[in-house]
Amino acid sequence: MGIRELITFRISGRGVWGYEFYDEARQKIGSVSSSVSPSLPVRIESQNIHWYSRFEMDTTIIPGIGRRVHDNQTGNEVFRLIYWRPGLYQVRSNSQPVQVEVKEGRYLFGQQGMPATALSERIPDIGWQPASSFEYEAYFKTTFYEKVNEVFALMVLSFPALRFY
C-alpha cells in the first residue's frame, strides 16, 4: 500500500497541528507536528495512520466562554471548545471524574491543582466524509497535560477519529 492522502483543509485558529502513527496493534510508532495558521492548508499523508489525530492550541482561560472552530473550506463546524466552570466533569466515559474549583480567583482541576483549560464537545453532524477505506468514529478524545515551566496547561483536543480498515 502506498502513501494516501487522508484529508486536506484549512483550519480557523492558530496553534500546532499534530498527528500520531500507530501500527496494527495500536502501538505508537511516531508522531509529527507543525505550526498552523488560518491561511495554511493542513495536509496529512501516511500509509500507517491508525488513529487520527490531534490539535494543540495554547489558549487564554476564560471560563464559561466557548469558541467554535470551523473548516474554512466548507464552513462546517469541526469542534466547539467549552471552557471549564466549577463543578464535576466526566472527561471521558471511562475516566475518573474531574473536580473543577476556584481558588484565589483561578480555576483549577485535578489532584495536582492544574489550571483548568477546556473540554471539547463533539459536533455530531458536520457533513464531513472520510477518505475511502476509513470509517468515521463519531467521538472526540480529550487529553490534558501540563507544559513544562509554564503557568497554564496545554489543551489537547482531537479531531474525529478515523479507524483504518
Describe each PLM feature range.
Residues L40-D71:
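Short, well-structured hydrophobic secondary-structure segments
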Residues M1-P41, Q47-N48, Y52, N76-E77, ...:
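Low-complexity or membrane-interfacial segments used for flexible interactions
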